[in-house]
Amino acid sequence: MSKLFYITHKEIDFVKWDQTILNSKAPLVFAQSFYLNATSAGWNALIGEDYKSVFPLTTKSKFGINYLPQPHFTSQLGLFGDFTKEDLNFCLDYIIKKYKLIQIELNHLCNHSATSKCTFVIDYKKPYSFNENTKRNISRAQNNGFKVEEVKDNDAILLSQTYLVPFLKNDLGLNEEAQSVFMILVKNAAKEKKLHTFKVINTNEEVMAIGTFISNGKHTIFLKGTNFDKKENTGSMHLLVSHAIKYFEGKSETFDFAGGSLSAGLAGFYKGLGGEQLNYGYLNINNLPWYIKLFKK
């Protein structure tokens, strides 16, 4: 077992941190510093000697009580790098003692008896295929004259604000804080040259669908996307995501649909595009004082 130490945000060496994440067996973009800086401003960490292993602490405070929530647009954190089961247990014991409320998702390598959540992924080292329904939808979009275009980062930021922020608000019911986090994340990813945005346009050059993706060269996530032909069901979203999957093949090891709490329809959509289910743990521990629990109700 290697000793891990509590390190404040200003003391973290982001270069070493990111090297550990990228060299990890789970090189998840969620855990990179530019991503955490957007989704959990001021985050702290537990860090092993010479950054051998790292555990981000996405701390927040309310009513004078520190708690550990899962950040927006993030599906797996936990311990990364070269670690043992004892190291993981040390981290979990530490946060249980330090935080009264813990609601975090652990990456799939943190084998722990937590509640299970899932995402869908494509491992590019393995064969994958689109199902017949997906192929029909792609053909429908192509027959309608739809085509996919990659969007330059400056335009992508504008399109994200124009199309995706209203989608987050009106369709997903996310609050202004989450909408702000999303735009900070998009801008951070663009600055780091890790943002990829695609749009589907029709024969009149009208936007029919848009999707944003973030990739670190090993792990690619489908951040958010929406289409504007839901009633017509013209297949624009199938066309867009299938294009992205092919685009990142050879440029990434894994394509992650970035799930969590998935509806049956969304799970079916991901499966149809070749996604395989990947389970990971959700740690939910509530040791809040009784009067806070009563207030939360």
Predicted regions and their residues:
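Short catalytic-loop micro-motif centered on adjacent basic/acidic residues
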Residues: 103, 149, 254-258
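Short, high-confidence coil segments that cap the C-terminus of an alpha-helix
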Residues: 41-43, 97-101, 195, 250-254
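Conserved acyl-donor/pantetheine-binding loop and adjacent beta-alpha core of acyl/acetyltransferases
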Residues: 61-75
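The substrate-binding groove and active-site-proximal loops of carbohydrate-active enzymes
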Residues: 75-82
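Non-catalytic accessory segments adjacent to catalytic cores
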Residues: 85-118
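A conserved beta-strand-loop-helix scaffold within acyl/acetyltransferase catalytic domains
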Residues: 2-50, 57-64, 106-112, 117-232
